[in-house]
């Protein structure tokens, strides 16, 4: 197993303390602390005695006097703001509103400092690991991790060998998923080093909350999140070849049917770069060009939101209609930078995840600042046998799974389901890991006309510009809305919360940035609404100018329909917003 202890539940003393002494609160918090189904979890607003924790005192003071009608009014205001801004995510080709809860998650400055340190450490170590794996492979020669761990990884692409980023950065953006266990300790649940989704909802959640609850922000020192796009643009521009003083950067999207298309469009607009599809680009002489209404334009950096397998039909899926033929050869020649780098999946494979603490110690000579969740490696005989013996009490996860799909919760599974998953583990040990049931921490969440505990996780986003790793203060808090559920994924009924990182009192810059963010979020005067809308439309029209059709062979209607159907299917196969 990847760590020593399997105990993720609190001690009997801690549990009995919470059950024995529970301060009663009235109004919308009535009965909150007596909900036994969540008694084993660490609640982030209330301690075991029902006292409000320090970071949440202002939130509690603001919300506690509210009655059911006021709660509903606040929730309706949030919903209308989201609809007005067109904030949705696509699931199975259908646009849906992204649920935002009205109670923010609050993280103290001291707690965030510890998390930020651990995230930076992890990203730096994984950066060194990827450079080594696609280079000298010293970690394999030294026997620190098994060679077969890499050769058996579906996302280890030999095609990526020889592609050396100009500034040495392969992980331009990372999403490190964290959970808080029953002891209140943050642990890493998963690394996302390819195309982590969700940052657009972080920014839009903040914008919406600031519009609806400006008074709350006025009484808290909440660090801003709106400058994410400027950090990302700096990282992408820094990634270009050193001889490019003004590099051309584009965002490559699978298309409008992808679940994260809203995010692709938002980031491109905020960075002031073109949003393109594969059909807008072509390669000639190992150089990538963009078709525009003004002619061809060379592209220097591509922030791609397309999976490796669809990126280049010359090297991966030959039937891909989303990618650009020859783009890998152009990257190998040093004429374009692909962000994040091809082959990064060998760094966020769920089995590789169990070795990350070892990777950190090997490359940095440091102990991990953030621990993993305890994990069994089913490909090791002794650990696999223990998993099979205890399968009714563990969580079994597919190594290649995403979106919460394929996970089996042993305590909730039927005998038939347990027999089926046992058979799968035996037949493909490399394809599975197992973990104890982690009682994710809880935060008050609106459920009908009351606030009730619901489990949450956290996805902070880190941006590496080659000089430093910057971590967005907070990140995407996802919440499991169905009662008792531990599955937070939006594709399975999850919602989200605005995540507040409180600035230290000494940080004047953070306070000023946060204040400016709130001011920008406030609704403009009515007389300006028409011109504002016109400006948005103009911006979108300018962005679409890059999508000139360019020369092509005529197709009959049947061929066109077939091509469109394939394009839609492949767009939906890409990574979902989770």
Description of each model-found segment:
Residues 1-578:
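Preference for protein termini
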């Amino acid at each position: 197993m990847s760590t020593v202890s399997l105990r993720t539940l609190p001690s009997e003393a801690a549990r009995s303390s919470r059950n024995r002494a529970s301060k009663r609160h009235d109004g919308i918090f009535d009965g909150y602390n007596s909900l036994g189904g969540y008694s084993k979890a660490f609640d982030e607003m209330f301690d075991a005695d029902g006292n409000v924790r320090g970071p949440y005192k202002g939130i509690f003071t603001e919300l506690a006097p509210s009655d059911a009608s006021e709660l509903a009014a606040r929730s309706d205001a949030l919903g209308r703001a989201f609809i007005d801004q067109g904030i949705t995510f696509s699931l199975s080709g259908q646009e849906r509103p992204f649920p935002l809860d009205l109670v923010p998650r609050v993280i103290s400055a001291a707690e965030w400092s510890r998390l930020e340190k651990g995230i930076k450490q992890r990203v730096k170590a994984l950066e060194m690991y990827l450079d080594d794996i696609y280079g000298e492979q010293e970690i394999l020669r030294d026997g620190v991790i098994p060679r077969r761990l890499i050769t058996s990884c579906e996302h280890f692409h030999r095609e990526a060998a020889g592609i050396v980023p100009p500034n040495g950065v392969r992980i331009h953006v990372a999403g490190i998923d964290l959970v808080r266990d029953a002891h209140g300790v943050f642990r890493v649940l998963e690394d996302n080093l390819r195309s982590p989704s969700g940052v657009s909802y972080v920014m839009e959640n903040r914008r919406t909350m600031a519009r609806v609850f400006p008074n709350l922000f006025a009484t808290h020192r909440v660090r801003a999140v709106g400058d994410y796009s400027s950090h990302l643009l700096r990282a992408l521009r820094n990634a270009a070849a050193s001889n490019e003083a003004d590099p051309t950067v584009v965002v490559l999207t699978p298309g409008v049917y992808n679940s994260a298309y809203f995010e692709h469009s938002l980031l491109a607009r905020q960075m002031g770069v073109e949003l393109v599809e594969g059909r807008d680009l072509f390669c000639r002489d190992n150089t990538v060009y963009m078709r525009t209404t003004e002619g061809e334009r060379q592209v220097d950096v591509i922030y791609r939101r397309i999976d490796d397998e669809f990126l280049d039909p010359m090297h991966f899926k030959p039937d891909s209609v989303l990618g650009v033929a020859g783009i890998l050869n152009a990257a190998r020649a040093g004429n374009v930078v692909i962000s994040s780098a091809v082959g990064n999946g060998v760094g966020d494979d769920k089995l590789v995840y169990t070795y990350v603490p070892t990777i950190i110690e090997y490359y940095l000579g440091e102990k991990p600042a953030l621990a993993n969740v305890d994990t069994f490696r089913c490909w090791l005989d002794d650990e696999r046998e223990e998993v099979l013996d205890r399968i009714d009490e563990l969580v079994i996860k597919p190594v290649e799974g995403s979106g919460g799909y394929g996970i089996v919760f042993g305590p909730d599974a039927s005998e038939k389901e347990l027999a089926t998953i046992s058979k799968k583990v035996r037949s493909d040990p490399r394809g599975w890991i197992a973990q104890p049931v982690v009682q994710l921490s809880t935060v008050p969440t609106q459920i009908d006309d009351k606030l009730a505990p619901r489990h949450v996780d956290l996805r902070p986003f880190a941006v590496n510009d080659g000089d430093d790793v910057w971590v967005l203060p907070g990140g995407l808090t996802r919440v499991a809305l169905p009662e008792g559920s531990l599955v937070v994924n939006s594709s399975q009924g999850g919602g989200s919360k605005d995540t507040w990182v409180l600035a230290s009192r000494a940080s004047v810059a953070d306070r000023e940035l946060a204040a400016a963010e709130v001011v920008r979020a406030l609704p403009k005067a009515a007389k300006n609404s028409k011109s504002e809308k016109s400006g948005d439309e103009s911006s979108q029209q300018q962005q679409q100018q890059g999508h000139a059709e360019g020369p092509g062979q005529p197709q009959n209607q049947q061929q066109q329909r077939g091509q469109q159907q394939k394009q839609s299917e492949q767009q939906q196969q890409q990574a979902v917003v989770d």
